[in-house]
């Protein structure tokens, strides 16, 4: 079983914001692969799918960004998912919009959602897909920047970039290692 989690904040006021880039990318995967069932459990919306005979859970935590680790830990425990079978999709302010990258592990680098995941999983060794949202424009505070909405052309760029890597789920469920996913898609 594979677990793909998009980090974000719930509520209409957060739709299309930079901090919800993980949810935007996850929506593209759900659209491509579909789902057979949807549940609200473990402080999350879980979309159940099957790709190449492998069960895949697409998850949107409903804990707000800074507490995402609570939901992810609960899901991993309940469904007995190993850390190697987890990918977190999240915004990355150190990349310009349009630059995205798979990564196998590392620190939170100031990202409070990732900090929560590290805290609750007890490790920073998990797979990620970092989605560039750009640095704050001059005069912006970081918190205001990440909670600001994408410009229309930026949002389109995020959606196109997410669609372009969506085949990683197909490769991953066929047994391609995450190292090879990085080599193929980065």
Swiss-Prot record:
Gene Ontology CC, one term: cytoplasm
Compartment annotation: Cytoplasm
One Pfam short name: Pept_tRNA_hydro
A Gene Ontology molecular function term of the record: peptidyl-tRNA hydrolase activity
Keyword tRNA-binding: yes
Binding site for tRNA: 14, 64, 66, 112
Biological process per Gene Ontology, one example term: protein quality control for misfolded or incompletely synthesized proteins
Catalytic activity: an N-acyl-L-alpha-aminoacyl-tRNA + H2O = an N-acyl-L-amino acid + a tRNA + H(+)
Keyword list, A-Z: Cytoplasm, Hydrolase, RNA-binding, tRNA-binding
CDD domains named among the record's database cross-references: PTH
Site feature: Stabilizes the basic form of H active site to accept a proton: 91
Catalytic residues identified in the record: 19 (proton acceptor)
Site (Discriminates between blocked and unblocked aminoacyl-tRNA): 9
PROSITE patterns in UniProt: PEPT_TRNA_HYDROL_1, PEPT_TRNA_HYDROL_2
Keyword Hydrolase annotated: yes
EC number: 3.1.1.29
Main location: cytoplasm
Family to which this protein belongs: Belongs to the PTH family.
Role: Hydrolyzes ribosome-free peptidyl-tRNAs (with 1 or more amino acids incorporated), which drop off the ribosome during protein synthesis, or as a result of ribosome stalling.
Assembly and binders: Monomer.
This protein's name: Peptidyl-tRNA hydrolase
Organism listed in the record: Mesoplasma florum (strain ATCC 33453 / NBRC 100688 / NCTC 11704 / L1)
UniProt gene name: pth
